[in-house]
Regions:
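NAD(P)-dependent aldehyde/semialdehyde dehydrogenase
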Residues: 5, 9-124
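Conserved C-terminal structural/oligomerization subdomain of aldehyde/semialdehyde dehydrogenase
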Residues: 70-235
């Protein structure tokens, strides 16, 4: 699974897909930092109070590495950081706004979902995540678990979020994050949100559903009677 915030959860099984994916990421331009470089990178990306340092935001990987105090080999375009812990105290599980990929290992899908929940407690609620799977059950379970407005399936995360002709997402540069993220909408904000709509209302035949129809299993007549009695006492 992947997130708009650069993080990746990878399954480990008997053939150790984790190492396979790590190797392929390196082929694609990733640089796996050592433990020493990880510590240097941590000091470069966050100040003593845990705030992101502005001089490492939206910067090339080589520039970030130089700021941290190590040199990136030629042809490497993003940094890979192995992480095993999640939480506000573990910065690489949070948003980095840079080509720095925090990578986590899991051994079963249920554990991956638990990790997703924990990561979104750190930050990123309402935004997006992705899953690289053909298992519809896994995709559906992630959709029920992740507090996000968009889930990209087998797609490049940030570009697919913004809409494409092959995924049905409205094209935009502004992604609504719903009440999860303190926004009014959870959609891709696009043309319809900037168009004024005039509602013309005329009287129609009353079609009022009963409380039982409205609330279903949540409807309790006893509570309604209790509320009515309380109103009568106040009157």
């Amino acid at each position: 699974m992947a997130f708009c915030i650069p993080r990746l959860d990878i399954e480990q099984d008997e053939i150790d897909r984790f190492q396979v994916v790590i190797a392929q990421l390196q082929v694609e331009g990733g640089y796996l930092v050592s433990d020493e470089q990880k510590a240097l990178l941590h000091r470069a990306l966050w100040d003593d109070e845990g705030h992101r340092t502005s001089n490492t935001i939206a910067r090339p990987a080589a520039a970030i590495a130089e700021t941290a105090g190590f040199e990136l080999p030629e042809g490497k375009t993003f940094l890979i950081v192995k992480e095993s812990q999640i939480g506000k105290a573990h910065r690489f599980s949070s948003e980095k706004l840079s080509p720095v990929l925090g990578i986590f290992r899991y051994s079963r899908f249920e554990q991956a979902l638990e990790m997703v929940r924990a990561i979104y407690e750190v930050g990123g609620k309402g935004h997006s995540c992705g899953i690289y799977s053909f298992d519809d059950d896994h995709i559906h379970r992630l959709a029920l678990t992740a507090p996000v407005s968009r889930i990209m399936v087998r797609q490049p995360q940030s570009k697919a979020n913004a809409g494409a002709f092959n995924n049905g997402m409205p094209m935009t540069s502004s992604l609504g994050c719903g009440t999860w993220g303190g926004n009014i909408v959870s959609e891709n904000v696009h043309l319809k949100h900037y168009m004024n709509t005039t509602w013309v209302s005329v009287p129609i035949k009353i079609d009022q559903p009963s409380d039982d129809e409205l609330f279903g299993d949540f409807y309790d007549p006893a509570l309604e009677m209790e509320a009515a009695e309380g109103e009568a006492m106040v009157a």
